[in-house]
Amino acid sequence: MNLLVEHSAARGRARTYARGGACNGTYAPSPAEHTHPPDGGLRYRARVLQPVSVASKTLSDYTHICGRDLIDEIRELAEPLKGSRVAHISATAFGGGVSEILYTLVPLMRDVGLECEWQVIYGREEFFNATKLMHNALQGAPQDLDEEQWETWRRYNEMNARELSGDWDVCLVHDPQPAALHKLVPEKARGWVWRCHIDLSTPNPETIAQLLPYIEDYPQSLFHMADYVPPGMNGKVNVVPPAIDPLTPKNMALSPEDGAYVCGQFGIDVDRPLMCQVSRFDPWKDPLGVIDSYRIVKERVPAMQLALVGSMASDDPEGWDFFNATIAHADGDPDVHILNNFNNVGAIEVNAFQSHADVLIQKSTREGFGLTVSEAIWKARPFIGGNVGGIPLQIEDGVTGYLVDSAEQCAERTLEILADPGLGKSLGRRGKEHVRTHFLTPRYLRDYLKIFNELRES
């Protein structure tokens, strides 16, 4: 794909013109360029903790998908919490699984009677560079932050803490970026929750040692898996996997004709087989390994195509470098389509790629949970995932999909699915029902309400 990008830093927008074929252009905007004023500085206090607008949602709309019993249980749990003031604090409102979850969770909390808000902390590029390094180190990367980067992280947390309004019943802090808020201003909420969305099973020892004093005393903390809980947490620890919203444009039912039409607009030959991975362009997601798997498959199935589809997040400056590395690894192959939101790939387009693909892949080498797994399986398509993190929670190997440990295994399973269409259909059908039971938003809302009730009673 040839990219011609015209970027305006002052206005924070990018226009991308894309034509079919392999992606061979490079582009790397700074997150500060399109999320924060270039001359903002720390003196622009009015821009700290920006509220995020969300559309309204109605819990009853999920009854036909999740069942009456769960909906009734949620309303019963919400009754004593009506009128409670709840704040979600995160690093970004754009890109990544956390923001996608909150665009559904916040309006549903409002629908059941909570006064719920979502606020995004202020940070410039120096902050996001430090927190991206922290994110990788907490998932096992060897490089820790230097003292200047730790000081940058603390300084921005202190600034945001000063501007956080008080009198919250619950303040729910997402991930390490704003994690210091509870230690800095505990008096601004009666109940505090730290929600960790990443894999802390084998963190860099220096990094977790620096972070632990800021997270250890949260009254409640939530992790995707028990293995992710670091030693030393003093409050109550909860294991709560995230979930997807089946009613969003990304996950709603899409006809085969519509899916094929959308894919065709991006240069996909809809009459040829397609492998697809939807994820951030991040080393842990291993898009380079997916390309390697595709090449093995293509030796046996010359018509095979590959789509790598990702959203570039505003708190991920390193992502653009790896996006360009992925393009380089594709080496100009016209059947490798590397796409992101700057190619006008939005929720409907992701839905189309997932619904149309013959095999869906998430070949992560480290993974906090991997919501793209449940999103993919919800489309009832055959799925292959890396045997890491939260992916095995969503996949029963050989029953609802396949778990793999290498590019070669991924290619082997892909070839099995292509050779037996009935196998792919049965994997997809069983996978969809597994997601319906365990990984849809109403279940996630129920788990949060239980925790809020515990905080209220304590």
Model-derived segments and their meaning:
Residues 310, 314-352:
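Nucleotide-activated donor-binding/catalytic signature segment of Leloir-type glycosyltransferases, i.e.
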Residues 423-438, 444-450:
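A short, well-ordered alpha-helix in the C-terminal region of glycosyltransferases
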Residues 44-85, 103-167, 240-246:
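A conserved catalytic-core segment of Leloir-type glycosyltransferases
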Residues 373, 382-385, 395:
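Short hydrophobic beta-strand element within catalytic cores of glycosyltransferases
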Residues 370-373, 391:
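Short glycine/serine-rich donor-binding loops of glycosyltransferases
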Residues 365:
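Aromatic "clamp/platform" in nucleotide-sugar-dependent glycosyltransferases that forms part
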Residues 397-408, 416-421:
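Conserved acidic donor-binding segment of nucleotide-sugar-dependent glycosyltransferases
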Residues 264-285, 291, 306-307:
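Conserved donor-binding/catalytic core segment of Leloir-type glycosyltransferases
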